[in-house]
């Protein structure tokens, strides 16, 4: 399960801002919002059939999307193992910052042309493991960097299907392990 807490609009967009939080409808009985269905289609390309359900809402913010997640895993796991695995993933940045404005500001001040290219920024103190099989937490989505990196990776995969991982390593110096 996950909840997408979306920004109202991008800071560069003059319209579309909302005055207060707005909840989204569940259009699918199986998936909830389209986000879980989109993720399910993506995972199916890797022959993974996951039980996903999502809800969505917009907030009156222009900074970053927030994702609340609740994952149930088959094998027992500890919080330390979750932290270690997240920290080992070069596309994941960890942070103690609990406001999107602070993470956005870090990206503006230190990121490549003001952008964070990591796929996600996990807020460490929100991570929780319950009953050794349920992982819960929050993460922020660096929207611009996320779409830029995904587009580059997709292009490289199309051009170099057997070597795209090697090709995108030139960007690794632009990823952050800690924000």
Q: Where are the regions a protein language model picked out?
A:
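A contiguous active-site-proximal alpha/beta segment in oxidoreductase catalytic domains
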Residues: 1
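NAD(P)-dependent Rossmann-like dehydrogenase/reductase catalytic/cofactor-binding core
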Residues: 114-179
């Amino acid at each position: 399960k996950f909840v997408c807490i979306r920004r109202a609009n991008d800071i560069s967009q003059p319209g579309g801002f909302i005055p207060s939080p707005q909840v989204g409808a569940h259009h699918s009985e199986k998936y909830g919002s389209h986000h879980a269905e989109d993720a399910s289609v993506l995972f199916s390309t890797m022959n993974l059939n996951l039980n996903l359900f999502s809800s969505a809402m917009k907030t009156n913010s222009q900074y970053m999307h927030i994702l609340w997640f609740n994952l149930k895993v088959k094998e027992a796991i500890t919080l330390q193992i979750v932290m270690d695995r997240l920290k080992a993933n070069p596309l994941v940045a960890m942070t103690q910052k609990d406001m999107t404005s602070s993470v956005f500001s870090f990206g503006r001040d230190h990121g490549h042309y003001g952008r964070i290219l990591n796929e996600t920024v996990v807020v460490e103190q929100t991570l929780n493991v319950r009953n050794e099989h349920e992982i819960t937490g929050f993460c922020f989505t660096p929207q611009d960097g996320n779409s830029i990196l995904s587009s580059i990776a997709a292009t490289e995969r199309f051009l170099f299907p057997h070597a795209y991982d090697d090709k995108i390593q030139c960007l690794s110096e632009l990823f952050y392990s800690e924000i």
